[in-house]
From Swiss-Prot:
GO biological process: translation
Gene3D superfamilies, A to Z: 3.30.160.810, Translation factors
HAMAP family in alphabetical order: Ribosomal_uL3_B (MF_01325_B)
Name of the protein described by the UniProt record: Large ribosomal subunit protein uL3
SUPFAM superfamilies per the UniProt record, alphabetical: Translation proteins
N5-methylglutamine: modified positions: Q151
Pfam families named among the record's database cross-references: Ribosomal_L3
Primary gene name: rplC
Organism listed in the record: Rhizobium meliloti (strain 1021) (Ensifer meliloti)
Amino acid sequence: MRSGVIAQKVGMTRVYNDAGEHIPVTVLRLENCQVVSHRTEEKNGYTAVQLGAGRSKVKNTPKAMRGHFAAASVEPKAKLVEFRVSADNLIDIGAELTAGHFVAGQLVDVTGTTIGKGFAGAIKRHNFGGLRATHGVSVSHRSHGSTGSNQDPGRVWKGKRMAGHMGQTRVTTQNLEVVSTDEDRGLILVKGAVPGSKGSWIVVRDAIKSGTPEGAPRPAAVRAAESK
């Protein structure tokens, strides 16, 4: 099991394939995605790598985190994410991952925080049909209807779909195709839409349902850490 990467959502555009068909893609950018720490079976009980991405000003970084980054000889990061990996896929601390970590045609799972929509009714939030236009319905055409049963169970069931805050939740979209990558500019082009707003942090992993393709680099596509 390989590590994923932390990317930033740039936006959407389109590209054309060899047949002249346009493909809607989301552009994801890797910015200083480096290994900050390890988790090992002996010390932590599991194996993982901690990646950091982006840049954070030193004055805005807590002292404890400054020491954490200094131990890895990397600049303070804006985002930290931990990825479970197998022991043979551990990556050296300080190594920088590139867009070549993924290959064109492979499937990936993309995780992000959806755009918040605020308080929404049941029709918008859950695609309810609403009540009838006439026949006794008055001023409640867009309500969700009954909230439950009678004296038994005498309460509203957990998970009942009702009006409430819509969006701003952690969502994973599975099996998106990698259309192409640009290693020099650190870009990954993924077919279709990706959860999150422009500029938000996105986590990209090998698709759990299809696994790692044969042509993918192991343990990762890395740019050697700069010597100090």
